[in-house]
UniProtKB/Swiss-Prot annotation:
Function according to Swiss-Prot or TrEMBL: Plays a role in processing non linear or branched viral DNA intermediates in order to promote the production of mature packaged unit-length linear progeny viral DNA molecules. Exhibits endonuclease and exonuclease activities and accepts both double-stranded and single-stranded DNA as substrate. Exonuclease digestion of DNA is in the 5'-> 3' direction and the products are 5'-monophosphate nucleosides. Additionally, forms a recombinase with the major DNA-binding protein, which displays strand exchange activity.
Descriptive protein name: Alkaline nuclease
Record text on subunit structure and interactions: Interacts with major DNA-binding protein; this interaction increases the nuclease processivity of the alkaline exonuclease.
InterPro entries recorded: Herpes_alk_exo, PDDEXK-like_dom_sf, Restrct_endonuc-II-like, Viral_alk_exo
Species of provenance: Psittacid herpesvirus 1 (isolate Amazon parrot/-/97-0001/1997)
SUPFAM superfamilies linked to this entry: Restriction endonuclease-like
């Protein structure tokens, strides 16, 4: 493990001995709910718990997890390095003994050790009983938590639409790294220039490889610890004179499985659209391709109307109108949605259209437009009613608290790719036509789809609406305490909430007893 993974002396020392494995069997047996339940069963009153800010309780819970990780042999000495204590401190002790800088280092450590996101056990357990964009709903005046957020959230097989959902998830997991490589090669001009200088970029990592470069783990809300966000890709730039963080670019990547097709299947409706788009690239043929499926990934709505929440991308350009489009007379949407629809309506997306791979050189590149550039702009903007916008909104809120003076630019990046032809299977494709300052070429793996379109959509956010989230963390903690103390009387007899929702409830000290040591 290279010491450049973590910027700064603290991270360099920490990384040497405590890089955590992605799989830690048993860690899901202790959630934030269990931390609160232990407090209730030990005789603490709700009033005493609520007298300490929720961020300190979240940190106390994390200290319990870290103690378990050390005791289980997954790391050594992480607890004293992070919390300056050989025993998990209480929320009161953390508030009294740790400085804001100490707390920030703990939160950045959590971020750095959860970069694999869904592939990381620590990420999974920390997201339990945590408000995220997916557990928020947006009502008329402000966001609030969904009724079912305070429970173990597990993805189960079966049910209507599962196969379709599983396909979309698999396509996304496989091709997010493909989109990341395209962003590095064509979209963000400074990403690779100083890769060996981690201080230029997002605080804790520049990525081990092109697969995970500039990836982000779980970043917790510094105010309450009750909200969290996991960004797909973030790039930080510092002021060369002051070394202060000046700019942060955040990319939320979405891979659209609904456009997957094989061009060898001439019966597929997208096959002909694809050929026309490559033969005559332009706004009209790109539009026809995007609208070439039953439920297009871009929704047209008339300028005097409001969109639905079905798709993340919108257009109200006259040339994109469909014959059956009708203006809605309903007053739909919350205040925050209406405000951001107004702000983003004039935004235009940057679109990269990729030609066919060259099998002689095993390479692929975007087409060159008459302007001489490798991209064009189209009248496509983000839908503030869609979950993707809300995800980006929460991410920006959480990140802005760490870097209040930095300029944060948000982008939704939509990747559309096709299945490989028979003669394309197994090929690693070099990305050509990108920046000339790359130290070495970036290539797509043999498992990646063949890129068709990469759509970069800027997202405009009104920070005045951050106040809508600022009180939500405290309210969520108060709700958590109320629910936990209400359940405490039955907790000993009921199945324990934790791994599998059926584990035996151990005592507080039992958690810290190591199982058979697992060395990594």
């Amino acid at each position: 493990m290279s010491s450049t993974r973590h910027g700064g002396n603290f991270q360099l020392e920490l990384a040497a001995g405590t890089l955590l494995p992605k799989e830690m069997p048993g860690i899901n047996a202790f959630t934030f709910y269990d931390y609160l339940l232990d407090l209730a069963q030990s005789g603490a009153s709700p009033e005493s718990v609520l007298s300490v800010e929720p961020i300190y309780h979240r940190l106390a819970y994390i200290s319990r997890l870290v103690a378990w990780i050390d005791a289980s042999g997954f790391s050594h000495g992480t607890l004293p390095r992070l919390f300056l204590s050989t025993e998990p401190p209480t929320a009161e002790q953390i508030k009294s003994n740790l400085s804001p800088s100490d707390i920030e280092q703990i939160l950045f450590f959590v971020e750095s050790e959860t970069k694999q996101q869904v592939g990381c056990d620590l990420w999974k357990v920390l997201r339990q009983f945590l408000l995220t964009a997916s557990t928020l709903k947006w009502v008329k005046n402000r966001p609030c938590s969904k009724p079912d957020w305070f429970k173990v959230n597990e993805f189960r097989n079966g049910g209507a639409g599962y196969a379709r959902q599983a396909m979309a998830i698999t396509f996304g997991l496989t091709n997010e790294s493909c989109a990341r490589k395209l962003i590095m090669t064509y979209v963000s001009g400074d990403l690779h220039r100083h890769q060996n200088d981690s201080g230029e970029f997002f605080r804790l990592d520049v990525g081990e490889s092109d697969e995970d470069a500039f990836s982000c783990g779980l970043l917790l809300d510094k105010r309450s610890g009750m909200l969290g966000a996991s960004m797909d890709m973030a790039v930080m730039r510092k002021d060369p004179e002051t070394a202060a963080v000046a700019e942060i670019d955040v990319f939320e990547i979405k891979c659209r499985a609904k456009y997957t097709f094989c061009p060898e299947n001439l019966m597929h409706p997208l096959s002909a659209c694809y050929e026309r788009m490559l033969d005559s690239p332009g706004e009209e043929t790109i539009r026809d391709f995007l609208f070439g499926i039953r439920a297009p990934g871009v929704e047209y709505f008339p300028p005097d109307s409001v969109p639905s929440a079905a798709e993340a991308l919108l257009t109200c350009a006259k040339g994109w109108a469909s014959p059956d489009a009708k203006a809605s007379t309903r007053d739909r949407g919350s205040l925050i949605e209406k405000r951001h629809l107004q702000l983003n309506r004039e935004v235009r997306s940057t679109v990269y259209l990729f030609g066919e791979p060259c099998l002689k050189t095993n390479s692929i590149r975007p087409i060159v437009w008459p302007s001489g550039g490798t991209s064009c702009e189209l009248p496509i903007f983000i839908n503030p009613k869609h979950q993707n916008f809300k995800q980006i909104f929460v991410q920006t809120y959480v990140l802005a608290d760490y870097y209040p003076d930095a300029k944060i630019s948000q982008y939704l990046v939509t990747f559309i790719g096709r299945s490989r032809r028979a003669n394309e299977f197994g090929r690693v494709l070099r990305l050509d036509g990108g920046r000339e300052d790359l130290a070495e070429p970036i290539s797509l793996d043999h498992i990646h789809a063949i890129p068709i379109l990469l759509i970069k959509t800027p997202v405009v956010i009104d920070r005045d609406h951050f106040s809508d989230l600022s009180s939500l963390g405290k309210e969520a903690f108060e709700f958590s305490v109320k629910e936990t103390w209400g359940n405490a009387a039955d907790a000993a007899a009921a199945p324990r909430i934790g791994r599998g929702c059926a584990a035996k409830k151990p005592g507080p000290t039992e958690l810290l007893c190591a199982p058979e040591s697992t060395q990594h």
